[in-house]
UniProtKB/Swiss-Prot annotation:
It comes from the Bacteria. It catalyses: pseudouridine(1915) in 23S rRNA + S-adenosyl-L-methionine = N(3)-methylpseudouridine(1915) in 23S rRNA + S-adenosyl-L-homocysteine + H(+). The keyword Secreted does not apply. InterPro entries: Alpha/beta_knot_MTases, RlmH-like, tRNA_m1G_MTases_N. One of its GO terms (molecular function) is rRNA (pseudouridine-N3-)-methyltransferase activity. GO terms for cellular component: cytoplasm. Specifically methylates the pseudouridine at position 1915 (m3Psi1915) in 23S rRNA. It is an enzyme of class 2 (transferase). Belongs to the RNA methyltransferase RlmH family. This is Ribosomal RNA large subunit methyltransferase H.
């Protein structure tokens, strides 16, 4: 299985990079995991609705440029589908079983994802209504993907 995580902006904080590196190492035996960063658009405070849409559209174009036709795309969004870890694990396993071996997760920037990215997504995922920095969301997503693999092999990691 190939897993790609596309995120807007660079991870500058060492503690986030270290955490992600740890999960990349742990997942190495289950999947080839690749992190792809796309440039974020500079967004000053107090943007109009039109300016926000423009920022999301520009970031969205960069994201879409990193997605291949065959990839199964899961967009992370507050309004996405919430599910327990066990259900998420089964969905990941089922995707592989049904021939979707290239899974791409997309994490938007501070303003979220463009309508074009949401339209391209085959599914959505939400970790709840909480607002989190998109940098932290990368680490949380990595942990949940790792947890899914652990659930699927019956590991005691998930208790």
């Amino acid at each position: 299985m190939n897993i790609k995580i596309i995120g807007v902006g660079k991870l500058k904080e060492k503690y986030f990079r270290d955490g992600i590196a740890e999960y990349l190492k742990r997942m190495d035996k289950f999947a080839k995991v690749k992190i792809v960063e796309v440039a974020d658009e500079k967004a000053p405070e107090n943007l109009s609705e039109a300016e926000m849409a423009d920022v999301k559209a520009k970031e969205g174009d960069r994201i879409l440029g990193k997605i291949k036709d065959k990839e199964w795309v899961i967009a992370l969004a507050i309004e996405g589908k919430q599910r327990p870890s066990e259900v998420f694990a089964k969905e990941i396993a089922d995707l592989g079983t049904y021939g979707h071996s290239d899974i791409t997760f997309v994490i938007g920037g501070s303003l979220g994802l463009s309508p074009a990215v949401m339209k391209r997504a085959n599914d959505t995922l939400s970790f709840g209504k909480l607002t989190m920095p998109h940098q932290l969301m990368r680490l949380v997503l990595m942990e949940q993907i790792y947890r899914a693999f652990m659930i699927n092999i019956g590991s005691p990691y998930h208790k």
